[in-house]
A protein has these predicted regions:
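N-terminal subdomain of nucleotide-sugar transferases
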Residues: 1-64, 108, 272
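Acidic anion/phosphate-binding donor-loop and adjacent secondary structure
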Residues: 149-150, 201, 217-233, 291
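Conserved donor-binding/catalytic core segment of Leloir-type glycosyltransferases
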Residues: 5, 231-254, 258, 262
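Active-site proximal beta-strand in glycosyltransferases
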Residues: 2-4, 129-160
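Nucleotide-activated donor-binding/catalytic signature segment of Leloir-type glycosyltransferases, i.e.
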Residues: 268-306
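Carbohydrate-associated surface elements
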Residues: 195, 216
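A short beta-strand/loop micro-motif in the catalytic core of glycosyltransferases
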Residues: 37, 113-114, 184-193
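Conserved nucleotide-sugar donor-binding subdomain of glycosyltransferases
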Residues: 68-122, 126, 162-185
Length: 306
């Protein structure tokens, strides 16, 4: 049995979006054989009341939380101009979190410190300084450099997005350096897919192995529609897109589909069968760029759903 300290960017319960889903099920899997301590940021509406996070409490020997640090546009601009780090390296950098991490490392002998996501990668420096014997696992939830590069290419296609493209161009260079450093500084690197592994391997010039740990969910924990007794009040849609709708790749995907594909689907189906077509965009926190889709015939932007 190993003693593992896991660092997460938000409390991974309830697991309601990609990051928290991955982190919760990683914790659940590791807890079967190892002793888990969790240090997590706590978002504004998250609760640490025992009844609210009972499944997470059952998996962890100890849970510590720190509020997400406030960060406004002025702070982001200052960091952009006065440092060489990428925006993501500043997003969750917190003196309170660093103090709590330092305390946990000083008070305990952790075999492994597992860092979930690039926003927390600067913690590597603290682990090296305070607990040099601890092995560091860096779980790179996205191949962030490649993701930002694709954002840049997407924005370059639209003159109205050229300011965003300029920002992305700066971030690509900074992320390349930072992500390479984080991967090289860790004792082990994990990612979510073979495609991400190839991107990270290229970034590292294949000097360090990258292990794929796919995302997973417990399908038995979700009620199937077949179990519902009354279907009469359920809305039905021909097409459904599900995802966290303030996540940039999801926003870009939905807008592209709406502009390039959706009109053709509606027209062809109406011409061939006389049927109208409906499309639901399902997911929490819809970005402001999606507002224009609410006016499209047949399109529903739901926001959060149970």
């Amino acid at each position: 049995m190993a003693r593992i300290l896991i660092l997460t960017p938000q409390l991974p319960y309830p697991p309601q979006q990609g990051t928290s889903l991955r982190n919760f099920y990683i914790i659940r899997g590791l807890a079967e054989r190892h002793e888990i301590t969790l240090l997590s940021f706590l978002e504004e509406k998250q609760s640490v009341e025992p009844e609210a996070i009972a499944p997470l409490i059952s998996l962890c020997q100890r849970i510590e939380t720190v509020p997400v640090p406030p960060r406004n546009t002025a702070v982001r601009l200052r960091q952009l101009l006065l440092t060489r780090r990428p925006d993501m390296a500043h997003r969750l950098y917190s003196a309170a979190f660093n103090r709590k991490l330092h305390q946990l490392l000083a008070e305990n002998q952790f075999d492994i410190v597992q860092i979930e996501g690039i926003e927390l990668a600067r913690a590597i420096e603290i682990v090296h300084a305070v607990s040099p014997h601890s092995k560091i696992v860096f779980d790179d939830h996205n191949a962030e450099t490649e993701l930002q590069r694709r954002n840049l290419l997407t924005d370059l296609r639209h003159p109205r997005r050229w300011v965003a493209a300029a920002y992305s161009a700066v971030q690509v260079a900074r992320l390349r350096r930072f992500e390479r450093w984080a991967c090289a500084a860790a004792d082990a690197v994990t990612c979510v897919s073979a495609a991400d592994r190839e991107q990270l391997a290229a970034l590292l010039n294949r000097q360090s192995p990258v292990t794929v740990i796919p995302n997973c969910i417990d399908v038995d924990g979700y009620q199937a529609l077949a179990d519902l007794q009354d279907w009469t009040n359920l809305s039905r849609y021909d097409l459904v897109f599900m995802g966290k709708m303030d996540y940039r790749p999801n926003v870009d995907a939905v807008l592209w589909f709406a502009d390039e594909v959706w009109p053709g689907i509606k027209a062809k189906r109406l011409a061939h069968s006389g049927l109208s077509t409906t499309w639901a965009i399902v997911g929490q926190k819809p970005h402001a760029r999606l507002e224009r889709l609410r006016g499209l015939d047949g399109v529903t932007v739901t926001g959060w759903v149970e």
